[in-house]
């Protein structure tokens, strides 16, 4: 049986924080967390007649991707994820993880490339400025 606080949180995120309306599209990104909150959010999105798009990440896989990050790859990822983000009306990001130092051995140069050529254009320029 699911903790009812998860359902209440999902309801508040969708209806209060995002003020999601019928026909709107929302991207739900979850990194390093269990599926229960994501499922509860999806149910609430459907209740208002909106469209959920979900992507779940495992921090260990993200680490491996970052180990090989290049400017070219970051720009390609930004191109594809940016196109998706442009279509969204709202966004919910859920972050967690068991290992706070998961990326500690990723070269600093790779992290900078990811930040400059992926995170900044997709999240700071598109998501923050154009979604709820």
Model-assigned labels for residue ranges:
Residues 1-132:
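Active-site bordering "gate/hinge" segments
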């Amino acid at each position: 049986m699911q903790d009812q606080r998860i359902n209440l949180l999902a309801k508040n995120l969708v209806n209060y924080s995002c003020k999601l309306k019928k026909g709107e599209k929302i991207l739900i990104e979850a990194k390093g967390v269990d599926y229960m909150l994501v499922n509860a959010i999806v149910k609430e999105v459907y209740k208002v007649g909106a469209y959920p798009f979900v992507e779940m990440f495992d921090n260990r896989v993200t680490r491996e991707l970052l180990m090989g990050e290049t400017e070219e790859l970051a720009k390609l990822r930004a191109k594809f994820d940016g196109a998706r983000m442009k279509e969204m009306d709202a966004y919910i990001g859920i972050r967690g993880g068991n290992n706070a130092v998961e990326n500690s051995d990723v070269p600093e140069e790779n992290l900078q490339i990811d930040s400059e050529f992926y995170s900044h254009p997709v999240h700071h320029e598109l998501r923050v400025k154009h979604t709820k």
